[in-house]
A protein has these predicted regions:
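FAD-dinucleotide binding site
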Residues: 2-497
């Protein structure tokens, strides 16, 4: 397998073969925890699938790019973009229109920590721009919007929170129910253990449980053999980034890899070859962390931004943080209310809702995801300044999704928690073994970029089958024993071939 130009452009496909109220209320809003395509089987008896692996007893998946109120899982830097574009998007317009959300975070984009901090930042800007208590609208009830709404209410403002969905939380969403030992988070899941002080304090105040997962990596080839450590892939990416930084113009990561020999790495050794190691990094670390394919991502700056994967998993349900922020707050909440137009040129701000109703406020905080802004779902009058428009176009909407599987019994014996599977089809998949968190056989895969698009095109049955194929290298044949009758009528365990 050579890392050709086509491979560089499509490496992120490699994950799985596949592979976040019409009326006004003054009550404490309680975000639901929707079950996004979960399925639970009536008995825990494992049923062998086509791969010889047992069928999962519970299943859940996300599709953030297909969500009309998300249009992506996060944001990334296209070629030529820098963090200055995020800062430009975050700037207030005429002290009337303010922006928040992960895409406006210069230091932690794509994370709950970045979104939460951006909501607090925008609330502070609104408070400083006004004179006393004002009527403020917050568009979007994700973590940025709810953080802004709570901070504004604490500062004495009259706040109305406008959310397009029936449920609050935005890209905080989970599959729950009896099929899962803890909520299967389809959007936000990880937080860092180090310096997320603001977010950590809020999570602790909300009483949400967390688990520090030891990230122990293990890579396996199609035959199940453990692959030894190699720096070939990371060295190739580092060389490409260094070359891109030295160029006067904008170049993609794919172009930088071609210029530095990434398309000519040796293929001898199959899954252990330098070429395969580079393809694995592009399909997992790059595609999942940034939601972008190599030809979409800035070669110079795209990898500067920290990955949204930390080493602490939220196990008590991230939706509880939204509940906590809005609990006992005198905040108007408009559910199932899309905003189609924001007019801000006459000293006030007018919001036109999809229902045809209008809302007049002093200022507005817009927290809708980048993909929604790019789609033009909200018309601004007057049009956004060119600096904001350029920033919106310079950033890319990330595409990353999750698939969760629960089994009746584990079919693996490795204690590693971060798996990279190189299956017989030559595809790479990143899996997390979450048994240390819950004590239950739960696995979670993450896919990004074009792999996420392929996942979205699969129905549940095809996706489960693809997931099991990608897990085959980690199966322990001794744990896949099937009962076979003996001459005495007693069952005898025979390993499944």
């Amino acid at each position: 397998m050579s890392i050709s130009r086509r491979t560089l452009l499509t490496a992120s496909v490699s994950g799985l073969s596949l592979l976040g109220l019409a009326a006004c209320t003054r009550t404490t809003p309680t975000p639901a925890t929707p079950t996004a395509t979960p399925s639970t089987m009536p008995t825990p008896t494992p049923t062998p699938g086509a791969t010889g692996l047992p069928e999962p007893t519970a299943f859940a998946r996300s599709d953030w790019a297909g969500d009309p109120f998300a249009r992506g899982s996060g944001s990334f830097l296209r070629p030529g973009a820098t963090t200055a574009d995020r800062e430009a998007l975050a700037r207030p317009i005429q002290d009337r229109v303010f922006f928040a959300g992960e895409a406006t975070s210069a230091d932690r984009p794509g994370t709950v920590a970045g979104a939460y901090a951006s909501g607090l930042r925008a609330a502070g800007e609104v408070d400083r721009a006004g004179a006393g208590s004002e009527r403020v609208a917050v568009v979007g009830a994700g973590i940025a919007g709810t953080a802004a709404a709570r901070a504004l209410r604490d500062a004495g403002h009259d706040v109305v929170l406008v959310e397009a969905r029936a449920d609050l939380g935005g890209r905080i969403r989970a599959a729950g129910g009896t099929g899962w030992p803890h909520p299967a988070e389809l959007g936000a899941l990880w937080i860092a253990a180090d310096d997320d002080d603001l977010l950590r304090d809020a999570i602790e105040a909300a009483g949400i449980t967390r688990y520090g997962l030891a990230l122990v990596a293990e890579d396996r080839g199609p035959d199940g053999a453990v692959l030894g450590p190699s720096s070939a892939g990371s060295d190739a990416v580092a060389a490409a980034r260094a070359w891109a930084l030295a160029q006067p113009g904008a170049v993609s990561l794919a172009a930088a890899l071609r210029e530095t020999g990434g398309d000519a790495l040796p293929t001898e050794g199959g899954a252990a070859s330098p070429a395969a190691r580079l393809a694995a990094i592009l399909a997992t670390d790059v595609a999942i962390a940034h939601g972008a394919a190599p030809d979409e991502l800035s070669g110079a700056r795209g990898l500067d931004e920290p990955a949204p994967v930390g080493n602490v998993a939220v196990t008590g349900g991230f939706a509880g943080l939204v509940q906590h922020l809005l609990r006992d707050q005198d905040i108007d909440v408009l559910r199932e209310s899309t905003v189609s137009r924001i007019a801000y040129g006459n000293g006030r701000v007018g919001l036109r809702l999809g229902s045809g109703e209008s809302l007049s406020v002093d200022r507005v905080v817009v927290t809708v995801p980048l993909g929604v802004l790019q789609e033009g779902a909200i018309a601004f009058d007057p049009a956004l300044p060119s600096s904001h428009d350029v920033a919106i176009r310079a950033l890319g909407p990330g595409r990353a999704d999750r698939i969760w599987l629960r089994f009746a019994e584990p079919f693996w014996s490795t204690t590693a928690t971060v798996w990279t599977s190189y299956d017989e089809d030559g595809r790479f998949t990143r899996w997390y073994n979450l048994m240390p968190i819950s004590g239950e056989p739960v696995l979670m895969a993450e896919v990004g970029a074009e792999a996420a698009e392929r996942v979205a095109a699969m129905d549940d049955e095809a996706l489960r089958a693809a997931a099991l194929r990608s897990l085959a290298p980690f199966a322990d044949t001794e744990l896949l024993a099937t009962p076979e009758p003996t001459t005495t009528g007693e069952p005898r365990a025979t390993p499944t071939p």
